[in-house]
Amino acid sequence: MYFPNSKRPIPASCGLPKTKEVFLTTDDGLNLLAWYQPAKNKNSSTLIYFHGNAGDIGMRAKKIKPYIETGLGVLLTSWRGFSKNPGKPCESGLYSDGRAAIDFLLQKGISEDRIILYGESLGTGVAVELASKPYFSPAAVILEAPFTSAVDIASWRFPLIPVRHLVFDRFLSNKKIFKIGSPVLIFHGYLDKTIPITFGQQLFNLGKTPKTSFFIKNAGHNDLYEHGALNQIMEFLGKNNLISKSGK
């Protein structure tokens, strides 16, 4: 379920010369690497990016760069056990890592109504968990290639094995998404063989308005940005007054 990469590149080597390394302290005492680029304006929003179950922090640099260029702040996180971070990844641990990212921004005076949660694949489970809490209402939630639950994914991958009782990290987004009152965007590729699009569609149907979706015919799991996803994300952000309508 988790495939940590120990690589720990620096922002400048990934095309982000003004982005700084910071460390997020979790409630169980871990200090985790993140990359932080403050918003150009003090009143602009900041996007927290929760990545998927593999790779390292630097592999998401190209994806966050356009958001920085619009003037948004970006906090690109890395999970415990990834990118040479201490700890071992698990469901409760990743939730703690996500809370640490929110706390980091709140301590900088960035209010929750200026925080955008962005989850990629596994990271969607963390984004949904955090946004579903009654005490936290982010500006928006963006879910890239999400799933209904880790249990459903395991059952799909191993249909002949009773895995539902064997999966301990469950990430039950299907039991939480209806609690989110913030604007939600879900997008997915029809050719996704890692998390089939049906899971993203089911999750979208379970959410409440305001919600938006787009599904890309020729995209798989990792190439959504190569098939026009960015433009539609920018349109969503513009409609919710989180960037200018021109995306600049």
Language-model-detected regions and their locations in the chain:
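An N-terminal hydrophobic leader/cap segment in hydrolases
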Residues: 1-25, 248
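Membrane-embedded segments
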Residues: 27-104
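Short alpha-helix in the alpha/beta-hydrolase fold that links the catalytic acid
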Residues: 63, 173, 182, 196-205, ...
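Primarily recognizes the serine-hydrolase "nucleophile elbow" in alpha/beta-hydrolase
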Residues: 104-108, 113-158, 168
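Short beta-strand/loop motif that positions the catalytic acidic residue
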Residues: 179-181, 186-188, 192
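Acidic catalytic loop of the alpha/beta-hydrolase fold
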Residues: 191-195, 221-223
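Catalytic histidine neighborhood in serine/cysteine hydrolases
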Residues: 201-222
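Post-His helix in hydrolase/transferase enzymes
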Residues: 224-239
